[in-house]
Amino acid sequence: MSIKENITQIIRELPSDVKLVAVSKFHPVESIMEAYGAGQRVFAESRPQELAAKVPAMESWLAANGMQNDIVWHFIGHLQTNKLKMVLPYASLVQSVDSLHLLEAIEKWGRDNGKVVAVLLEYHIASEESKQGFSEEEIKGILSDVGRFPHIRFR
């Protein structure tokens, strides 16, 4: 089954209030174009370099074909603070904020750039120490003091 056929079938079966997020990591821009042709509009990347390359490529392709840029990009996976400049100009949602250090760095980027960044906090439910994310207490602390993060929209 082609990408277009697969996405068309999935979208047809989804309730109207559910959005499909297509993870495009490791796929070439041509695959994103095919998915776009099937009606897919929300894409996610987990590698900053890929996001920073694919967004302008898709913007150019849409413009060259006289189409409106209605793609929404998410960032998934672990994000390092030194990669924020590659991700935040493009991602409408960062799905993987896993530390206070990263949250504070995103707040600073938003303040410096006059932007509000939408984020999801990663909740650490595993007992494994190697896993990342916030504890329940940390999340409660952050959410009780959201005024500290005026450039972040918690979703």
Walk through the language-model features, giving the residues of each:
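Conserved alpha/beta-domain cores
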Residues: 1-155
